[in-house]
Amino acid sequence: MDTYSPTEVEAKWQSRWDELGTNLFSRDDLATAEKPYFNLMMFPYPSAEGLHVGNIYAYTGADVWGRYQRLKGHDVFQPMGFDAFGIHSENYALKVGVNPNDLIPSNISNFTRQLRRIGAMFDWNHTVDTTDPNYYRWTQWVFLKLFEAGLVEKREAPVNWCPSCKTVVANEQVIQGLCERCDSAVEQRQIEQWFLKITNYAQRLLDGIENIDWSSRTLTAQNNWIGRSEGADIDFPIVGRDESIRVFTTRPDTICGATYMVLAPEHPLVDALTNDEQRETVEAYVEQAKRLDLKARQYVDRPKTGTWIGAYCENPITGAQMPVWVSDYVLIEYGTGAIMAVPGHDERDFEFASTFDLPIKRVIARDSSNNAGLMTEAYVGDGLLVNSGEFDGLSVAEGKRAIVQKLEANSLATGQVRYRLHDWCISRQRYWGPPIPIIYCDDCGAVPVPEADLPVLLPRLEQFKPDDSGDSPLARDTEWCSTACPECGGAGTRETDVSDTFLDSAWYFLRYPCTDTDEVALDVDMVKKWLPVNSYIGGHEHAVLHLLYARFVTMAFHDHGILDFAEPFEKFRAHGILSKEGRKISKSRGNVIIPDDLISEWGADTVRLYLMFLGPFEQGGDYQESGIRGPSSFLERLALSVAEASDGKGDEQVLQAMHRTIDKVSNDIEQLKYNTVISALMEYLNVVREGGRTCSKQELEPIIVMLAPFAPHLAEELWERLGHNSSIFESGLWPEADPELAKVETFEIGVQVNGKLRGSISVTADTSEDDAMTLARSNERVATHLDAGEVRKVIYVPGRILNVVVN
């Protein structure tokens, strides 16, 4: 093989893998695997446009990890599927005038072709397609199991409604008041919806964060989204009525600074407390607030609006009367839907009070002397209580305890823990999704469909465009809607909402090893063998939706005896994002990179290698058109080296370089620092070929094995050329470094400060200037002189001297 033809090599080995079933598991293979390792990556939504280079980046990085684990001797199960239901597919089908039942199969076929072409080791024997009745039958089963567990509830609630998509959209899908799918302004509606009670698991989900090996930014996002708050429920008696307004606050220490109350527009007391003089104004304001989406109402920088409802309540500590207002900056979903407004110490309350000329009172000061004067902004720092009567001089923490104790003694407060997390609304008034398996009966109410009657098939509708009724298009298929009640046999009507696509993806990983059976959703033996998932790689953007929902479903199934583990993914890593020539890649910028063209020109291995060379996998990198030539040249030189290889043994210097490379590559690949892995392999090849020397097979075999996760086709070809008959991935061939040979030579160099020798440090040939300075600062004698002034200049000659100029 004097020349390297990617097209020929890749076609040959993809065909060979298919013929031999190299990447496939039979049911027996799954059952008998000795070292099972489940390597999962997020399954894609199969768009009509196909995969773009960002997708290829993500899937290649995950495949590199899976192939590495296989070379370490694991039986790596790496399935792939398609998240094909949902509003994206439906909207595109409406746009092009094609039924989604016809559109999705061709999209999946194209995605499969692209995924095969990049050479990933997917097990195509175990795929899932969320639109397949054999899959969504079990999604409906998941719903029923959660229903049996008391974790499903139908209730009326304010929701974000997109008038263009004509369906409910989650808070997370509203960006700056616009629907993320179509950019239409979102409004608020009160609609009966099906909810999954994820809030029952809020604390469990928080506690579990401590025990899973996930990307820190993903765990932080989940922690913030769940949003645990410790505080108190406090009752404010309503003047002239024998009832109270209950508020939840995390700052009971500031109660003496509460100068007015605010109710959310949806709060039932708004209507009950509004007097006749204010009713017309209040009702108009409430209607206006309903037209706003829930997420936009949370923006801190929104102008504050509201109106007094004509009522007062009493501050339970000071006895002062406080006017009761209604404003859209208070949300019914958080706390009790009512707040005690403390404008002196809350920025939103301060802005509201300033807008409507309401009193602002300081009750927290940095020290006891700083308790007077006009407040020009809210003070949100720590300090001592002031202007708080008997509580003056207490710290914030002491004030919280003392005030709650006094209120509790008078039955006006109770300590509480609340969460930002809301229950998960799964109802969608669209066509393209799994029908929710519920039947309504006038006598029996909402009745779950018996498991034996699953799946509730989604009928083919030729007219599936949603309308303004708020009902799903399925409601127009009266024949489908009409059915018998499973309990009494009387007339029944099917639920016409379909479920959120995030329910499809909340459990798909559980199904992968069980696709060989249609009798049950989860094969107990297979689930015990292969789950929880060992490694999961995907996008950080799914931190608070898919990943949180998957954890919830898994915990619920564990609690009800379906699973014997409570966390679905032992390890999760969020991959980085690519840019192009320094600019974000997007359709609007016209700089989307199509992988098919790249692979046709350069070959899949070169594309894989280049993408992984762009930067640490968890950070991403910048795609440069000219950058791909370097990886291409490297593969060509390696192929040429194999063609010219001798049977002799390597010399001692090359042997040491080999083991240092094995050591570095093994360490860096564990940290997903794929770019430095590739750099190390390139450097090693330079050492092996230095001065035009002929490489030995012994010197080349380790580099080929370590390259195999990145360039699997060429690695297989070169392995065969070196005389091996089996696949490079069959026998756990990952090399181990000899600690003695991998030792890096160290030597002492002098450290001069302002031209005078002040000490020495121990370095290697690879020690960087920054590392050398760190070592110098750790030397007490040197550090004394470095700290005497400001470092103005550093002159570092690797292996010789470190010279520092200090002012």
Model regions and ranges:
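Amphipathic alpha-helical
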Residues: 14, 199, 204-228, 264-307, ...
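Conserved oxyanion/phosphate-binding beta-strand-loop segments in alpha/beta enzyme cores
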Residues: 1-40, 70-79, 102-110, 214, ...
